[in-house]
Amino acid sequence: MSAHCQVTGRQPSFGKSVSHSHRRTSRRWNPNVQRRKFFVPSMGRTITLTVSTKGLKVIDRDGIEAVVAQIRARGEKI
């Protein structure tokens, strides 16, 4: 499972870890993504989305129907 939110588009960010002696090594920060199932009444079925915690708040605010319409408008298959 890739660390990519289907709602917000959030992806891993990259940077450096800095030790006490100031050695810099590459690292990445993964978003908190979860696989969640949502029932979509207009489709009459359950869909599984990979969403970040911010994406869950967006679904709570806008509703699953609006979010599914946005995802389909981007051309993603659900």
Swiss-Prot record:
Biological process annotations from GO: translation
Annotated region (Disordered), positions in chain: 1-29
Listed SUPFAM superfamilies: L28p-like (SSF143800)
Matching Gene3D superfamilies: Ribosomal protein L28/L24
Keywords of the record: Ribonucleoprotein, Ribosomal protein
Domain of life where this protein originates: Bacteria
Molecular function GO terms recorded: structural constituent of ribosome
Pfam families the UniProt entry points to: Ribosomal_L28
One GO location term (cellular component): ribosome
HAMAP family documented for this protein: Ribosomal_bL28
Family statement drawn from the similarity comment of this UniProt entry: Belongs to the bacterial ribosomal protein bL28 family.
Name this polypeptide is given: Large ribosomal subunit protein bL28
